[in-house]
Amino acid sequence: RYTMNKGSAYWLNETRNTDENFDLIELANTQRAITNFVKIQTGKEIPVEFIANNEGDSMTDGKKIAISSLINTHNLDSVIGTALHEAAHCKYTDFFVLKRIANRLLETNLMGGRRWIEMLLNFVEDRRIDNLVYHNAPGYQDYYRAMYDRYFYSTIIDRGLKGKEYREENWDSYAFRIINLFNKNTDLKALACLEEVYNIIDLKTIGRLTSTKHSLDVAIEVYEVLNKYFSMQKREGSKHQEQENRKGAKSNGPSKEEIKKAFAKQEEFLKGNVPKTKVNKKEKQQIEAITKSK
């Protein structure tokens, strides 16, 4: 896990309270630093911007990267990690594949599974591009650890993976456990097909996937395995299997509602919906003026 004495602590000259938010000058300096990191990573001049209240959503579209204005020394490394993750999408993700996914699913008669295939694609593609950055730019690893600690790892998720919840044979259970396959608390016996899914995705050799199309191929393969299993399950029933799934599970795990809330945060990250506090128009203009003056 990530610790606060790494990452930006090497270059940030900061002695203030870790929860005290940055002022406009500090935000401008942070924007400049992240822009440099992104340029080094991608080799491109990709704008890194704060989003004003009247400028719509803050999702990265492959052309620019939006960052939150609510930054302090406590969350700075995770903000940088998120920007680097989005920069990796700009460099490695083929947005044309994402835009034409409906065509691919129509051609293969899989449109009914679009929601789950897109979720699986987001998961596999994130693992693919993060693996590239993690190995090609080891200096950024602490920022990535901070990002994952903020958006993926939590005591609720850790205990939930070992507990009795999300062991029903349905899509929600598989989604929760697939998204957390890289968590050390993963239980591959929690669901009947989870180990097969784990082997198909094969996180240890994720580097074998060299394109977004390859990620989509894996997502479709996983979907087809699970869809076939669920079709068979409707005929045979799942009560006995779910009893087997709960063997060895911890009885003192968190409630389903607690897990659901933490899981929703992970799902939003996968969709690119990372909460980013916006600035007002005047503040944005002031930050831009500070940046241009240096």
Regions found by a protein language model. Give the residues of each.
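Short, functionally important secondary-structure microenvironments
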Residues: 2-294
